From Swiss-Prot:
Gene: mraZ
Gene Ontology cellular-component annotations: cytoplasm; nucleoid
Origin superkingdom: Bacteria
Name this polypeptide is given: Transcriptional regulator MraZ
Residues spanning the signal sequence: none
Single biological process term from Gene Ontology: negative regulation of DNA-templated transcription initiation
Length: 160
């Protein structure tokens, strides 16, 4: 599973290096060096403001997600919600393989959507990797501090 946060950069052409640890997990845990890069679900910050990150899904994890979205009404989504999820996650998805140096080219439209400029963060999220700009990551961390369930029985049940 993907764990940890790795800080890196993205160049003016949109190239960035996938952290070596995450490339290793793609191959060793998920059995494939291929992955899909797409837009994240909306990150709601400060009321109505919405930001996006990017997400790396291991190849077969993304295919499983596509299968689940074939009949999203079984997930309790309305037809309109399902269409929005498909347009947000599936439409911008690109299949990728890092080059021999571990680099990948992030398409311009995805870079703009996620506001990726220079400093970026790769964040391990179990079966996927989130990618955030420095500014969006700082705001996500602020939200996490506010939303963290301090006195939760669920956390106690997890041993936290």
């Amino acid at each position: 599973m993907f764990r940890g946060k790795f800080d890196t950069t993205i160049d003016a052409k949109g190239r960035t290096s996938i952290p070596a640890k995450f490339r290793e997990i793609l191959l060793d845990t998920f059995g494939d060096e291929r992955f899909f890069l797409t837009k994240s679900s909306p990150v709601r910050l400060d009321g109505d403001q919405v930001c996006y990150g990017l997400v790396i899904y291991p190849y077969h994890e993304f295919l499983a997600l596509e299968e689940k979205l074939k009949d999203g009404t079984a997930l309790g989504l309305t037809v309109n919600q399902l269409a929005s999820v498909r347009r947000t996650i599936l439409v911008p998805a690109v299949e990728c393989v890092a080059d021999k140096l571990g680099r990948v080219l992030v398409p311009n439209d995805l870079r703009k959507t996620a506001q990726l400029e220079r400093e970026i963060h790769f964040v391990g999220m179990q079966n996927k990797v989130d990618i955030y700009s420095q500014a969006v990551w700082a705001r996500v961390c602020e939200q996490d501090e506010q939303n963290f369930p301090v006195d939760s029985a669920a956390l106690a049940g997890l041993g936290l």
